[in-house]
């Protein structure tokens, strides 16, 4: 017996290949978008299974060695600004739930009480003001010491559903007053930048 692995980067193309009989299975939740999984799971022609137990948590990575993320007030503001409920329902189609800790409380020794950050844009804006950022020219972008709050937000485009998640997060940051440039790169480029510390914000 043998099996062949076929790499199909595009999410829609994967589903089409499955429907056309070109492939027999799609393996891994990171390789299929939430809407793609929902589409397949609702089709009686296909079987599907999802493991309820996972050690994986998606998180927003900030480079603490660079401004503005070296300021805890800015980091707290971002925590209030990002709409986790929208990510849970609209981006991940209810298949993933918002996490308050790195590991789910269902895991051994992980049921800890932590401070939570419900979505509160007004609170986020107040924290940015406390950190010294203001929109002095009414262009929607915050400034501090004459410098606009511009950041690069990079991510690996090889993982399903991440595109929409990044767009949702970027929209929240723009509402907060960030000038966000999104950089979608391949996995190797993303990982190399991460290890070298050559990033502002990553997902």
Model segments located where?
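Short, well-ordered beta-strand elements
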Residues: 2-6, 25, 148-158, 180-183, ...
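Extracellular/periplasmic solute-recognition and catalytic clefts
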Residues: 4-66, 89, 201
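Short loop/turn segments at beta->alpha junctions
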Residues: 9-10, 32, 83, 120, ...
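Short, hydrophobic alpha-helical packing/hinge segments within bilobed ligand-binding/sensory domains
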Residues: 14-15, 23, 36, 74-75, ...
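Periplasmic binding protein-like
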Residues: 18, 174-203
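Sec/Tat-exported extracytoplasmic proteins
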Residues: 22, 27-30, 41-44, 64-66, ...
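Append "and occasionally in soluble cytosolic enzymes with long acidic Gly/Pro-rich linkers
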Residues: 49, 70-171
